[in-house]
């Protein structure tokens, strides 16, 4: 007996982009936010070609933008329009607020890609309990 696996189709995939002050940091001529935007655009394009649903969430101290995951042809254009208007904010990002909003708004099993920067391992460890990790 041999198990055969099929790739999942139409899986919701969300790019979650932190627009807080830590993403303003420069790296090789671009800000970390610029790299997050470029990566999320490239990944969204590939996912749409593979017939997955893609969505976008941007946040800092509050949720700034939410685009529900969808596989429509116009979805990449909507993502580009949302990303064009993203700028870094000065307040620190509120991960507790982010995770509570994600639990309410995303009820289907989804792939979440978080674009952020933790300046120290201690900053990462402070945020893990909010994500349900010990």
Please identify what each model-predicted range represents.
Residues 1-74, 111-115, 129-130:
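An amphipathic, basic-hydrophobic helix/alpha-beta surface used to engage anionic
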Residues 24-26, 79-84, 107-111:
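A generic short-segment signal for beta-strand/edge and adjacent turn/coil regions
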Residues 27, 51, 71, 87-90, ...:
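Short coil/turn residues that cap or connect secondary-structure elements
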Residues 29-32, 85-90, 113-121:
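Short, contiguous acidic/charged loop-to-helix segments that flank catalytic cores in large enzymes
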Residues 65-95:
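Short, charged loop segments at secondary-structure junctions
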Residues 93-134:
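Exposed acidic/Ser/Thr-rich ligand/metal-binding surfaces
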